[in-house]
């Protein structure tokens, strides 16, 4: 077992409650993920986004494979080592789960989950927000070819 995986870079959450102005008025930028690791090269792929919208006590969960544009007006923006999920908030609040996969330089694949729940006030601003982050989990280890015995 290769324990160097534990030193891998991972993503942290930046909770941003910025409402974009102008053309995109009313879209709240929330959340943002950032690489805070040790600089090891890795690539990130947001695999799945689940949006559970609270609409008058009816829970609607929609899962989309990212990157995506859908009826909620959601999209992803990458800036350097940050990935922003731009989510158009429902007037009732709701819950969003991002399933993020990343791959290290040795092609091991890790998965990390970020869950957000939020309430939106009458001015369409986030009035309360809570989030959970799971530790990166190894989901696929590079297959080592052990045929060559010398």
What are these regions (language model features)?
Residues 1-42, 47-50:
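Membrane-proximal alpha-helical anchors
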């Amino acid at each position: 077992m290769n324990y160097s995986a534990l030193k891998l870079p991972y993503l942290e959450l930046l909770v941003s409650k910025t409402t974009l102005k102008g053309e995109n008025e009313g879209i709240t930028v929330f959340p943002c993920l950032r690489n805070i690791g040790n600089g090891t090269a890795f690539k990130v792929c947001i695999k799945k986004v689940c949006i559970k919208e609270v609409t008058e006590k009816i829970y609607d969960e929609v899962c989309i494979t990212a990157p995506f544009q859908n009826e909620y007006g959601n999209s992803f923006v990458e800036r350097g080592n940050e990935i922003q999920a731009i989510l158009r908030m429902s007037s009732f609040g709701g819950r969003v789960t991002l399933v993020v996969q990343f791959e290290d330089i040795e092609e091991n694949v890790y998965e990390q989950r970020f869950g957000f729940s939020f309430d939106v006030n009458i001015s369409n601003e986030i009035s309360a927000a809570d989030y959970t982050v799971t530790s990166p989990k190894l989901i696929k280890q590079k297959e080592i070819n052990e045929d060559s015995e010398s």
